[in-house]
């Protein structure tokens, strides 16, 4: 039977997977994970919003009249186009990849001074 032959052939090998979340693989240095926005550097130009195809970023007006991006983590495809387009380097790509949550409000990163 071919299935037993396959089991005997592959059984002595080391396992290919990890016991996640108890064991974690090292994240590559060029990994593109969740983005972080430094709202102190952001001038609200909106270039990141224009570049974001899945509309994970949107400009919101703060009470002081300035505009800052709101980040919808669940919509993001982690393409880092917003990182490349930001003239002030206010957006950075992190190595954070564990983004699952039970709280839908945690999926939206609001600029300071706004609430949803």
List the model feature ranges, each with a label.
Residues 68-75:
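Hydrophobic/aromatic-rich structural module bridging two neighboring secondary-structure elements via a short loop
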Residues 79:
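Basic, alpha-helical nucleic-acid-binding regions used in initiation and control of genome expression
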Residues 1-62, 70, 84, 88-116:
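Non-ligating segments of multi-cofactor redox enzymes
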């Amino acid at each position: 039977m071919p299935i037993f032959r396959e089991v005997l052939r592959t059984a002595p090998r080391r396992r290919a997977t990890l016991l996640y979340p108890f064991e974690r693989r090292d994240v590559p240095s060029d990994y593109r994970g969740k983005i972080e926005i430094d709202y102190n550097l952001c001038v609200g130009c909106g270039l990141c919003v224009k570049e974001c195809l899945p509309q994970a970023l949107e400009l919101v007006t703060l009470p002081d009249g300035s505009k800052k991006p709101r980040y919808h983590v669940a919509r993001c495809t982690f393409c880092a186009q917003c990182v490349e387009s930001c003239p002030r380097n206010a957006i950075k790509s992190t190595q954070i990849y564990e983004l699952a949550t039970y709280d839908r409000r945690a999926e939206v990163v609001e600029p300071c001074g706004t609430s949803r």
